């Protein structure tokens, strides 16, 4: 019998279900159906290798079940020792690779069921956990990865960690199932003051941004905190609500949305406002139709003013007026940069966030060698790249030698700025929702675009490119200047017109087309951009498309862009 997600949550005994029995079943590599939902809250998804699914079916074998495990690493900061431990886990239990996500977490792929518990224990031994990395709860909290402003970053990171801890599910299930914590009387009846019996209607995402950099794409988050800095001092945060990327092809009842800025709070009000926002979504969100369950639809269905008033009522105070701020871009800066405290930070471009040893670069081995130096820290960026941070000036040469030896700067040396900054979700072969390739197709598509960019003198012009294997939008494609959203194998929707700041949604330009048609559609647009763009303002491709009337805002019924006058 198939149970609804809401029923599974409410009867799970605080996320326990029958997970222990599923894990102990030697007959199958899969979990029981209800437990496949519950394990998400513990930080894992059951998947199978879709490349060999048909062959296994012909052989009358069950699918090649495996598990993806995602870490909870608020702000994406870990120590060299933790890096080495995670590297060892990837080599021993997973598919010999690590993957940096767009939310600054790690993903391990290819873990089999009988090694799932040992893998979880190994991760926790590093003082990193996976609780609430997935599921209808608050997910990993993003933080701006700006390495220049060390003091401001430290404050943002600390605040994000506070919010992350505060919004964790209150259950011992995780520790009982994975870490063999002794069960006590009343297990399964813990008080859950924030989430209640049914948790949230859908996933919930929070990001902390530090203007002028919007690397977290804060307006794609359900709840955003935009740091207001004056002369290096953090005054507090502007609050934004209602962002979200997911949609369904051809369904006018679903759409991506850019968040609204609703006011300003001080640092000591963070937990109260976060709790108020989350519980408002808990109680008012749509639990009957999951595709309409995200917070963005709650806002659109009830009205922004109604939701803001409810948030203020629950918080016990009124929001102050939003403070002026401005974003310049949402990308990363590659290579070495000097921090405000005199140390140095090296940003490496990692295509689609994949860390593995390949024919072109030995990222897994090379980063292991750097971690063994035990200096600084590793910071994952929301653009799936990596910052080796806090390097003393006298040790830069040692890092440079390892970078050259292992080819770690292969991404930094990509022939186009577009390729250096592109993002893609995992998609095939492991994601069950993927309709087309994304991560595996990104290098080929970037290479196919290269001649067009070079022909028009745009090779070193930053253009935001993102690929997604399905319309759920894990790579935040709807904010990109150019996006491919998978429709079927080898076919994509071409979306155009986002901007470099993460403030405007793009628009469907061509539907369900192949690579040749995509390139043919882009050629005349890139030619006009090269010839007619405003070079005095460094006009972006998406901005040019709108100024020239070549594209309009998308026809979604609600918030499609952030009004620039709010940023004055």
UniProtKB/Swiss-Prot annotation:
SUPFAM superfamilies: Nitrite and sulphite reductase 4Fe-4S domain-like, Nitrite/Sulfite reductase N-terminal domain-like. One of its GO terms (biological process) is cysteine biosynthetic process. Binds 1 siroheme per subunit. The keyword S-adenosyl-L-methionine does not apply. Component of the sulfite reductase complex that catalyzes the 6-electron reduction of sulfite to sulfide. This is one of several activities required for the biosynthesis of L-cysteine from sulfate. This is Sulfite reductase [NADPH] hemoprotein beta-component. PANTHER family: SULFITE REDUCTASE [NADPH] SUBUNIT BETA, SULFITE REDUCTASE [NADPH] SUBUNIT BETA-RELATED. The keyword NADP applies. It catalyses: hydrogen sulfide + 3 NADP(+) + 3 H2O = sulfite + 3 NADPH + 4 H(+). It comes from the Bacteria. Pathway: Sulfur metabolism; hydrogen sulfide biosynthesis; hydrogen sulfide from sulfite (NADPH route): step 1/1. Belongs to the nitrite and sulfite reductase 4Fe-4S domain family. GO terms for cellular component: sulfite reductase complex (NADPH). Its EC number is 1.8.1.2. Siroheme binds at residue 474. One of its GO terms (molecular function) is 4 iron, 4 sulfur cluster binding. Alpha(8)-beta(8). The alpha component is a flavoprotein, the beta component is a hemoprotein. Pfam families: NIR_SIR, NIR_SIR_ferr. Gene3D superfamilies: Sulfite Reductase Hemoprotein, domain 1 (3.30.413.10). Its cofactor is siroheme; [4Fe-4S] cluster. InterPro entries: CysI (IPR011786), NiRdtase/SiRdtase_haem-b_fer (IPR005117), Nit/Sulf_reduc_fer-like_dom_sf (IPR036136), NO2/SO3_Rdtase_4Fe4S_dom (IPR006067), NO2/SO3_Rdtase_4Fe4S_prot (IPR045169), NO2/SO3_Rdtase_4Fe4S_sf (IPR045854), NO2/SO3_Rdtase_FeS/sirohaem_BS (IPR006066).
């Amino acid at each position: 019998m198939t149970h609804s997600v809401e029923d599974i949550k409410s009867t799970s005994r605080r996320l326990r279900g029958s997970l222990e029995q599923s894990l102990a079943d030697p007959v199958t590599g899969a979990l029981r159906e209800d437990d496949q939902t519950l394990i998400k809250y513990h930080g894992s998804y059951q998947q199978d290798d879709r490349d060999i699914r048909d062959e296994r079916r012909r052989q009358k074998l069950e699918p090649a079940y495996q598990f993806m495990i995602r870490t909870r690493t608020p702000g994406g900061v870990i120590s060299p020792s933790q890096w080495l431990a995670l590297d060892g886990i990837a080599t021993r239990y997973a598919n010999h690779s690590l993957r940096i996500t767009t939310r600054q977490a790690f993903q391990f792929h290819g873990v089999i069921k009988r090694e799932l518990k040992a893998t979880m224990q190994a991760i926790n031994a590093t003082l990193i956990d996976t609780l609430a990395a997935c599921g209808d709860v608050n997910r990993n909290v993003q933080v701006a990865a700006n390495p220049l402003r060390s003091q401001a970053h430290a404050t943002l990171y600390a605040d994000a960690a506070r919010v992350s801890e505060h919004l964790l599910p209150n259950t011992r299930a995780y520790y009982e199932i994975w870490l063999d914590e002794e069960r006590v009387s009343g297990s399964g009846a813990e008080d859950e003051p924030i989430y209640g019996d049914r948790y949230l209607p859908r996933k919930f995402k929070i990001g902390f941004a530090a203007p002028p950099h919007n690397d977290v794409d804060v307006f794609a988050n359900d709840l955003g905190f935009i740091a207001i800095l004056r002369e290096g001092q953090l005054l507090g945060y502007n609050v934004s609500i209602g962002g979200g990327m997911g949609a369904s092809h051809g369904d006018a009842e679903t759409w991506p949305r850019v968040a609204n800025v609703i006011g300003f709070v001080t640092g000591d009000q963070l937990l109260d406002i976060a709790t108020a926002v989350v519980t408002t979504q808990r109680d008012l969100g749509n639990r009957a139709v999951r595709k309409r369950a995200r917070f963005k639809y709650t806002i659109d269905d009830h009205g922004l003013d109604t939701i803001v008033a409810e948030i203020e009522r629950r918080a016990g105070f009124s929001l102050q007026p939003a403070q002026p701020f401005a974003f310049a871009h949402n990308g990363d800066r590659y290579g070495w940069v000097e921090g405000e405290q005199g140390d140095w930070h090296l940003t490496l471009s990692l295509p689609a966030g994949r860390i593995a040893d390949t024919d072109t670069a030995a990222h897994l081995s090379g980063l292991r060698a750097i971690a063994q130096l035990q200096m600084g820290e590793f910071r994952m960026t929301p653009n799936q790249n990596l910052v080796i941070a806090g390097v003393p000036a006298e040790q830069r040469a040692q890092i440079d030698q390892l970078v050259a030896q292992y080819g770690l700067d292969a991404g930094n040396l990509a022939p186009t700025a577009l390729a250096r900054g592109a993002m893609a979700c995992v998609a095939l072969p492991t994601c069950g929702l993927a309709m087309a390739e994304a991560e595996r197709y990104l290098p080929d598509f970037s290479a196919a675009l290269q001649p067009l960019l070079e022909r028009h003198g745009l090779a070193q012009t930053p253009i935001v490119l993102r690929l997604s294997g399905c319309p759920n939008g894990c790579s935040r494609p709807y904010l990109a200047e150019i996006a491919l959203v998978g429709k079927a194998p080898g076919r994509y929707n071409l979306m155009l017109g986002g901007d470099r700041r993460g403030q405007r949604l793009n628009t469907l330009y061509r539907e369900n087309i192949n690579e040749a048609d995509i390139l043919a559609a882009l050629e005349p647009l890139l030619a006009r951009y090269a010839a007619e763009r405003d070079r005095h303002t460094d006009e972006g491709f998406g901005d040019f498309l709108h100024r020239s009337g070549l594209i309009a805002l998308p026809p979604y019924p609600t918030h499609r862009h952030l009004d620039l006058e709010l940023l004055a």
